[in-house]
Amino acid sequence: MTNIRKSHPLFKIMNDSLVDLPAPSNISSWWNFGSLLGICLGIQILTGLFLAMHYTSDTATAFQSVTHICRDVNYGWALRYLHANGASMFFICLFLHVGRGLYYGSYIYTETWNVGIALLFAVMATAFMGYVLPWGQMSFWGATVITNLLSAIPYIGTDLVEWIWGGFSVDKATLTRFFAFHFLLPFIISALVVVHLLFLHETGSNNPTGIPSDMDMIPFHPYYTIKDMLGVLVMILALLTLVLFSPDLLGDPDNYIPANPLNTPPHIKPEWYFLFAYAILRSIPNKLGGVLALVLSILILALMPLLHTSKQRSMMFRPLSQCLFWLLVADLLTLTWIGGQPVEHPFIIIGQLASILYFSLILVLMPLVSIAENHLLKW
């Protein structure tokens, strides 16, 4: 008799995706982040669901309801900080996952890559709206500043902003709709994850060498299920350490002050995972130009398959490209640091130089160095 996991219509799908899936025999720990992102999404949906049971999306009570969750609800503090720091873990895994894709040329699978970019935008939108919900000072002013950027769109900008706000400023209507979308989007993200995996399983996984591995595959279970479990344990250990020892390490103290439209915080800044894009936005002294640069800083990922000029897929055997890749990583860390600094000398010029370097590396330097490496191969 055939095993039920291979014959049952529902179990068969799970089996072909998680058990008998042929996987390359040489994929490294950099391939663990997909499963970690799945775990992160699960943690966020579960903790978010329980938080939503106690949260009220009304400007008069939102801040108080979050305080109530932390003080009066059983393990409410744990739920709240798991959710807040879970978002940080989510973005750490996301950035490493995307970085892996850039380094090893995974973007050659264009459908999987493009769905991944859509996922990145969806997760960023969800995180932004979630940051508004506690209705602290940084929630309110962050929402005001970021939504106001849409007013830079010619002709329809102002109407668009007022339509999103549901009035003439960020208020009750804005908070209610942000809560609704913040609740809805993770389920859309879950659907996109299924599409992402669907496209990935059409082609099979890439591997560190970038060479097709069709002739040397191993079953996903038990080899990679065990390997993924190690990654999960390390991530959960890191998350619990953050939650139990310094839950406010990555947050902003201003968000413990209730939202006040009459009092602007000295430095309005988003959560740490948006700081690199925020630095790029601020480095251009024109509103529309800044908004375009902000969007392009992420959307530029969609150009990666077109900018691939190397004869090799992976950077594993391309030392010059590796140097530029790690320069890009250092540049992004610099931008993240600058995004959290006040707009004054010397931070302005550092941010502008880092922004120029970011786009130059991706659009010009990396493709040129790849062409040079192709010629060096002939020697």
Curated annotation (Swiss-Prot):
Spell out the CDD domains in the cross-references.
cytochrome_b_C, Cytochrome_b_N
What GO terms describe the biological role, i.e. biological process, of this protein?
mitochondrial electron transport, ubiquinol to cytochrome c
Q: What transmembrane ranges does the database entry give?
A: 33-53, 77-98, 113-133, 178-198, 226-246, 288-308, 320-340, 347-367
Q: Does this UniProt record's set of keywords contain Secreted?
A: no
Purpose of the protein: Component of the ubiquinol-cytochrome c reductase complex (complex III or cytochrome b-c1 complex) that is part of the mitochondrial respiratory chain. The b-c1 complex mediates electron transfer from ubiquinol to cytochrome c. Contributes to the generation of a proton gradient across the mitochondrial membrane that is then used for ATP synthesis.
Query: Quaternary structure?
Result: The cytochrome bc1 complex contains 11 subunits: 3 respiratory subunits (MT-CYB, CYC1 and UQCRFS1), 2 core proteins (UQCRC1 and UQCRC2) and 6 low-molecular weight proteins (UQCRH/QCR6, UQCRB/QCR7, UQCRQ/QCR8, UQCR10/QCR9, UQCR11/QCR10 and a cleavage product of UQCRFS1). This cytochrome bc1 complex then forms a dimer.
**What is the protein name stated in its UniProt record?**
Cytochrome b
Organism annotation: Dobsonia inermis
